[in-house]
Amino acid sequence: MKTIIALSYIFCLAFSQDLPGNDNSTATLCLGHHAVPNGTIVKTITDDQIEVTNATELVQSSSTGKICNNPHRILDGRDCTLIDALLGDPHCDVFQDETWDLFVERSNAFSNCYPYDVPDYASLRSLVASSGTLEFITEGFTWTGVTQNGGSNACKRGPASGFFSRLNWLTKSGSTYPVLNVTMPNNDNFDKLYIWGVHHPSTNQEQTNLYVQASGRVTVSTRRSQQTIIPNIGSRPWVRGQSGGISIYWTIVKPGDVLVINSNGNLIAPRGYFKMRTGKSSIMRSDAPIDTCVSECITPNGSIPNDKPFQNVNKITYGACPKYVKQNTLKLATGMRNVPEKQARGLFGAIAGFIENGWEGMIDGWYGFRHQNSEGTGQAADLKSTQAAIDQINGKLNRVIEKTNEKFHQIEKEFSEVEGRIQDLEKYVEDTKIDLWSYNAELLVALENQHTIDLTDSEMNKLFEKTRRQLRENAEDMGNGCFKIYHKCDNACIESIRNGTYDHDIYRDEALNNRFQIKGVELKSGYKDWILWISFAISCFLLCVVLLGFIMWACQRGNIRCNICI
């Protein structure tokens, strides 16, 4: 019986010890930062996968699917190519004297006049597209001794045979075709674009029927250039009932220069000139519909927003557009390192600081305090450190956009077959530029993300050190982002620590006294586990002894009989 009483006393003594830190003479103050249940993964210089509370996508990966007609003037080519509109194909007459910022060519565009080719098609197309106008001025060329305004059934204008409206097909008059020698000076202060051509008959009979001479010749000159073309007579694939063809050429006459045309046959003469303008107009092949909306950036896929620094919708763009990169996604960290809060905090609901985990539910700030004292628990944000971090992060996105947005258009590149090697080289250069920009973009974002995370970590450390300097010897760093305060610290006291008005001298004596007392209790209570295990072992031993003694006593009295057989 004495043993049982002694063991009961030991158990009661062990569990009657006060839990350190749970009395009214101490308090706990923890510092922490905002956290979310599911963060966003970003890349930094040192880590390919680091979780942050918030991030902004930097790559625009989709278009609106339509081309906006504002603020750029969009001219829909419909079923006409730009060159057909330039030459005056009958079904493209609606484009005469039109202007544009962006001419949109459709995949269903077709020619509906006499068969032609342009030896330097891409250059002429680009030249006219960048001029942004089809403004045409008719001039009084004098063509003596020939028949003008030739036409063809392949180029009907209404029910009658016709021809390109900007060109004049000259044929023999009677049985003669004299040598033509015409000059046209440029007395204006702008460049003039003259379009002319050479007819290639399908047979020698057609050649003499139209031009008398068995072989014609066309020479067009300025002070800066000269082109001489000899017709190539021969049958070609039939197009709209014709096996002949026309080659289209062009000449630019500078102010003060003179255009000279010399020919003895096969001349497709100009009727005037196109007024050349300088600007940033362009052309784009696209089947996206044109709609009434606003967008600064246009791609063949449709307009895209330019509020992001990068895009991977299309390499071809017009306007102020994000830079094209290969990556589908690049995320810019706009929040701090995310460490989700641990849900289980022990039997007594202990709180922990930023070293263990972040705090979810902090909607009024990025950094803050949690406390546990005689009045309960509480939480408050630290607005000063929060604002310091936000001020430095804000503007990151705009700065990246300013560094990368193109203020010009990336035109389509076209080359003739004979320029295949140049095309291959140009493609290699463009691909290299894209690779370089893609690498630079990833590096730039990784650097910015590293800076953001280091910055937010630094603000947390600054707040922790500021609190440590206030508390001094009145509290002990618990190693998890918390301080154990060794004096009674009510809510007013906690608030003074948060706002920086805490006076450690007021509580110094109380803190020192409590520190020594609590340390002593903690030292004694450190043997509690040993006492419990020893008590348990002794109890088990005594129970076994009592049970064995009972069995032996019963056997002696005859109450229990034990037979052993061999």
Swiss-Prot record:
It is found in: Virion membrane; Host apical cell membrane. Glycans are attached at residues 24, 38, 54, 181, 301, 499. One of its GO terms (biological process) is fusion of virus membrane with host endosome membrane. It is a single-pass type I membrane protein. Residues 1-16 form the signal peptide. Palmitoylated. This is Hemagglutinin. GO terms for cellular component: host cell plasma membrane; membrane; viral envelope; virion membrane. Residues 17-530 are extracellular. Disulfide bonds join 30-482, 68-293, 80-92, 113-155, 297-321, 489-493. HAMAP family: INFV_HEMA (MF_04072). SUPFAM superfamilies: Influenza hemagglutinin (stalk) (SSF58064), Viral protein domain (SSF49818). Its main location: virion.
